[in-house]
Amino acid sequence: MMKQINADVKPHFGEIWMCQLKGDGSIQNGYRPVFVLSNDKNNAFSTTLNVIPLTSKMNKRRLPIHVELWDYKRYGLRTPSTLMTEQTTTIKVDSLDYRIGVIGDNQTLARIKVALSIQFAVFAYV
């Protein structure tokens, strides 16, 4: 049986957590919300997980790889925010601070799925 790595922090797919990101230049950094992208099996037993950083700067160019969250309070956010799928990254679980919300509605999850499929060209080569 696999042993759970970090019993204190239990992120799940779709949740939004506050996180300290270590990026530089145009890579998102600092203390910000992130969307948990990796699956729950990975999240339960791995020391790392995949996340999508969010930004509150809504004046960026509208790209098909961005998902705007105008109904921000629904997700536990303080301001309208954008998921930036081009900034998807792997982090250590212990860099998560606390959970602020969850994106669980099918409409928004479908928009995230489309943005990810465009960013990573998942279906372009099948």
What are these regions (language model features)?
Residues K22-S26:
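Short, charged beta-turn/beta-strand-edge "cap" motif at the junction between a beta-strand
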Residues I27-Y31, V36-D71:
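Compact nucleic-acid interaction/catalytic patches
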Residues D8-P11, N42:
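Short, surface-exposed loop and linker segments with low hydrophobicity and enrichment for Pro/Ser/Thr
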Residues M2-K3, V9, Y72-V126:
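C-terminal terminal-subdomain/extension
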